[in-house]
Amino acid sequence: KQQKKVKSPSEVTTDHLQQAKIYGDQGDYENSFIELSFALRTFLFHQFDIPKENFSNEQIIDKLEQSGLSNQALTQQLRQLLNRFEMVLYAPSMKKDQWKLTWEEVCLWIKQFDKA
């Protein structure tokens, strides 16, 4: 029987990031941010066991610190990213200006763990 290949967490994360870029390039900033959020949440879930839903930014940061991520710079970057996701929720017009930067920062943030 043909085994359906299960994607690794990093493949799933990468898929979301690629999709976010496609949406952004097409001017669909709404969906771009949704995909970026999925990418980040998928990564946090698999890397740090942080639930994908119903978790406030503060809870995410707390959980990161509990899980032994003592790198303040990384924690700070994530905090800024999460704040930006929140900001564009309340100010959707900012998505157009922010998606590219957000995309780059999510990619960079996740990449730092490949080395770690």
Give the role of each language-model region:
Residues K1-A116:
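Solvent-exposed, low-complexity, intrinsically disordered
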